[in-house]
Amino acid sequence: MTVSLKKGQKVDLTKGNSGISKVIVGLGWDEKKSGKGGLFGAMFGKKGADIDCDASAIMCTNGKCISAEDVVYFGNLRHKSGAVTHMGDNLTGAGEGDDEQIVVDLTRVPQQYDRIVIVVNIYQAVARHQDFGMIQNAFIRIVDCRNNTEMCKFNLSENYDGMYAMVFGELYRHDGEWKFNAIGQGTQDPGL
């Protein structure tokens, strides 16, 4: 049964789920169709560049990323520990369901990492004059790999105008158990 989360809510992933080891972090978004390209763009077939959202998993120690190697994204698809794997880049966000997926083997996450922050940024957001105000239906969900069951889902529904990147949520270790925190925090940092 899926737990529908609101911003700031947390859910335990491993307590009471004996045997869970791998989860899929599924992320999705759609580009808003209105206003893109303007009147002349509609008349003459010209439009701005597609919005390319990119998901990343940042492995943190005491809440901080220690090394660039600890960022798993389209340019570094697998963490050196083998615990986190990015399943590839979706350049348009088109289609139903997850646009990008990150697989996390909770049992292989080295002890020095206490959280895995899941962020999504817009590729070349500043140069393309794009922000998360142009995105709709954004979500993050956690799926149990054993049976492909959705454990929890967080729909990001706030207005994120002017934000170039978003912290969707985080997996974190607390007292030996893994939990998920629905964050939904935007930032104007285009380099995140």
Question: Locations of the language-model features?
Answer:
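Intrinsic-disorder/low-complexity signal
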Residues: 1-115, 119-192
